[in-house]
């Protein structure tokens, strides 16, 4: 994964690459998913902090931090609300393969830049507040996806009903079956039942509130819902956990209102959330460098 606020060889700051995703519709009552409408409306680069935005900062909010350019890499299509789709897509997003968003650069090395931070966006119910999720869950996905399918994976304890495999005298048959068993082993076997973002969620919330209109209801949530929102979040957290990488990812739940006004509000809040995430990580890196 790229380094936050690292420098190029010429001394200039490298841009911070932030992956953004949104979901496709999944309910008859909500034929338009505001998470995707917000995501696709975002610019390619995070705009500079405007003076009028800065005036919304309360006295309890952390001061703005000088940050390098921030490139927003929005996934080019809404993600289907389907377990298999998400299962296959998430590793490609983080590892720069397949459908990973392109930076649009001409150089080959710029086509699939490494992701420094990620923000998955999903729709909640008809509520008026916006919430960032602290944790994702490994199990409990009992609802059908948009295609009427259940999550086909089984928890680890169900996969290990019998560890003793038959073995022929020459050992070849047993070796083959052992190999097949390992291939079929649950992808999340051995992982914690909950994984938390490595971002300082409280600090991100303070900064997000500081950059946003004071009347907006912005919160931290402890339960992403154990549906596709939770599933994609845990998928990212688990992929990074297994790779030994910093879990620099958050999930944002937005209201279900997909009106033009609501999408415009959501767009601005997402931009300020990304700013808050980047500021928090840049400040953390600075503290680490000076040994605070």
Question: What kind of feature is each model-predicted range?
Answer:
Residues 1-224, 241-242, 255, 264, ...:
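N-terminal catalytic or cofactor-binding beta/alpha core of small enzyme domains
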Residues 226-279:
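Active-site-adjacent mobile loop/cap segments within catalytic or ligand-binding domains
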């Amino acid at each position: 994964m790229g380094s936050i606020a690292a420098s190029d060889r010429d001394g200039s700051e490298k841009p911070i690459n932030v992956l953004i995703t949104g979901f496709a519709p999944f309910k008859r009552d909500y034929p338009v998913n505001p998470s995707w409408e917000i995501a696709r409306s975002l610019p390619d680069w995070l705009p500079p902090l405007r003076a009028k935005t800065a005036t919304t900062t309360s006295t309890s909010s952390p001061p703005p931090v000088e940050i390098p350019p921030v490139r927003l890499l929005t996934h080019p299509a809404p993600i289907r609300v389907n377990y298999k789709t998400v299962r296959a897509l998430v590793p490609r997003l983080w590892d720069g393969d397949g459908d990973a968003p392109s930076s649009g650069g001409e150089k080959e090395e710029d086509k699939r830049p490494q992701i420094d931070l990620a923000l998955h966006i999903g729709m909640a119910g008809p509520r008026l507040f916006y919430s960032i999720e602290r944790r994702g869950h490994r199990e409990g996905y009992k609802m059908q996806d948009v295609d009427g399918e259940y999550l086909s994976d089984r928890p680890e304890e169900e996969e290990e009903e019998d560890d003793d495999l038959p073995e022929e005298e020459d050992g070849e048959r047993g070796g083959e079956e052992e190999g097949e068993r390992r291939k079929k082993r649950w992808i999340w076997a051995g992982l914690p039942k909950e994984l938390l973002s490595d971002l300082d969620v409280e600090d991100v919330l303070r900064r997000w509130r500081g950059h946003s209109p004071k009347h907006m209801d912005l919160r931290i949530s402890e339960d992403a819902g154990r549906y596709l929102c939770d599933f994609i979040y845990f998928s990212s957290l688990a992929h990074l956990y297994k790779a030994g990488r910093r879990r620099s990812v958050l999930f944002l739940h937005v209201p279900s209102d997909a009106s033009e006004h609501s999408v415009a509000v959501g767009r601005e809040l997402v931009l300020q959330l990304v700013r808050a995430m980047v500021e928090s990580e840049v400040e953390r890196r600075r503290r680490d460098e000076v040994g605070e």
